[in-house]
Curated annotation (Swiss-Prot):
<keyword id="KW-1133">Transmembrane helix</keyword>
<feature type="topological domain" description="Mitochondrial intermembrane">
    <location>
        <begin position="128"/>
        <end position="471"/>
    </location>
</feature>
<dbReference type="InterPro" id="IPR050365">
    <property type="entry name" value="TIM50"/>
</dbReference>
<keyword id="KW-0812">Transmembrane</keyword>
<keyword id="KW-0809">Transit peptide</keyword>
<feature type="transmembrane region" description="Helical">
    <location>
        <begin position="111"/>
        <end position="127"/>
    </location>
</feature>
<keyword id="KW-0999">Mitochondrion inner membrane</keyword>
<feature type="region of interest" description="Disordered">
    <location>
        <begin position="29"/>
        <end position="101"/>
    </location>
</feature>
<dbReference type="InterPro" id="IPR023214">
    <property type="entry name" value="HAD_sf"/>
</dbReference>
<keyword id="KW-0813">Transport</keyword>
<protein>
    <recommendedName>
        <fullName>Mitochondrial import inner membrane translocase subunit TIM50</fullName>
    </recommendedName>
</protein>
<keyword id="KW-0811">Translocation</keyword>
<keyword id="KW-0472">Membrane</keyword>
<feature type="compositionally biased region" description="Acidic residues">
    <location>
        <begin position="71"/>
        <end position="80"/>
    </location>
</feature>
<comment type="similarity">
    <text>Belongs to the TIM50 family.</text>
</comment>
<feature type="domain" description="FCP1 homology">
    <location>
        <begin position="185"/>
        <end position="328"/>
    </location>
</feature>
<dbReference type="Pfam" id="PF03031">
    <property type="entry name" value="NIF"/>
</dbReference>
Amino acid sequence: MLRNTRLLTRTISSSLRFAATKNTRLPTQHKFYSKKTDKKAEEPQSILTDDLLAKAGFEDPNEPKEKSEQQESENGEPSEEEKSNGQEQRSRRKRRAQTSKDIQRERYANMFYLATLVGGIAGVGYMCRDWDSEDEQTKLEGKDIDNGFAPNLMYGRLNKRLGSLFTFFSEPVFENLLPPPAPEAYRRPLTLVVTLDDLLIHSDWDTKHGWRTGKRPGLDYFLGYLSQYYEIVIFGSNYQMYSENTVGKLDPFHAYVSYALFREACRYKDGKLVKDLSLLNRDLGKTVLIDVEEDSWSMQPDNAIPMKPWDGSYDDTLVKLIPFLEYLATQPVKDVRPILNSFKDKSNIVQEFAEREAKLREQWKKDNKHLFDSANRPNAGNFLASLMGVPTSSVNKEPKMPLDIIREHGQLQYEHFQKYLKENAPKFLEEEQKLKDEFGKVSLNKLITEGAPSADDIAKVQAERAAAQQQ
């Protein structure tokens, strides 16, 4: 009995010791190995989980809605609740970010907007004022807009003055596109302005050769012959970077073309490209323009000879145009505009001038009939010529019309000049290369501070070289 009691006591004490050990170790394990940070007691949960309820056939009516919201959140689209929460947070953040500095900035911004509005209204009202002078009215081309405070007159003055603010982009860079003319003793009688594209040259493109540029037939003779009567100015409609080399090829010795102007010297008016001859620094009464675009001569139509664009085919229009231009330059004309306007169709001026010349020749023969009658009669001059061995055929010639004499003289001068160019061509090319080498050494700093070399500087260098060669 006693023995059984001792065994029971040992068993109970062992159980109690084991229970005490177990109770003391559980909190220690929970403290060091649990990842939960919330120390509050967990709420009791039902053993009936969603999986068990689904297997048993029970479904939650709110489950589709929750699933749809879950799918939306998984797809990256916020749910309605999240949207409302986000809007509330943004509104709170905005109210919280509105500081006194922000309020001050808003006040200054509102004051700036108000000042800009008032200044704009005042500026518009000032530009609607009456013309300050007749010079301003003429300069802004507002002759048809009178002074007054009628709405249409005020709007007209406002439009003209606003348009003048943007003339920087539509006007040429310089008021005088050409330097002053040469002294009277060295000056050509007239100035001939000719366009480049589709009059003197024509550019064409194809898949085999690409871009090709051709000279019009008779161009060299046209420029060389008329250069003795006219100051020739090529006024192209294309940009200088594209046309400058072409002009250099047409006149490699700089013997025919006095100046070359390009698109940068044109004026933009009402969306049109206009060549304003009044900016050439030449007398308009002694200036002739030959162009293929109607917009080019819209400001001086009386000075223009319109021509049809050349398409690259063979023609002799330039050569046929020489007699009229030669006649115009060799006559004592003070103003060429009345003569040009006397033609019915200036685009057909070659044919009309040929008809006028034929009538003039017939009239001259009638008026000088006695000269033709005495041409074939024997006289003392024929007898002396036969004694000297001069053929009588060279003496007994029909009298020549003054126009024919002028043309013979012009042709003779042209031939002499061409001969001179051929003989001195290497010398001209060498001098030109020396000038390029001399002025090509100009540094960028010198070009910015002193500018490009002028014509006087180039002439001075040429004179110094000529003097050095003579010594």
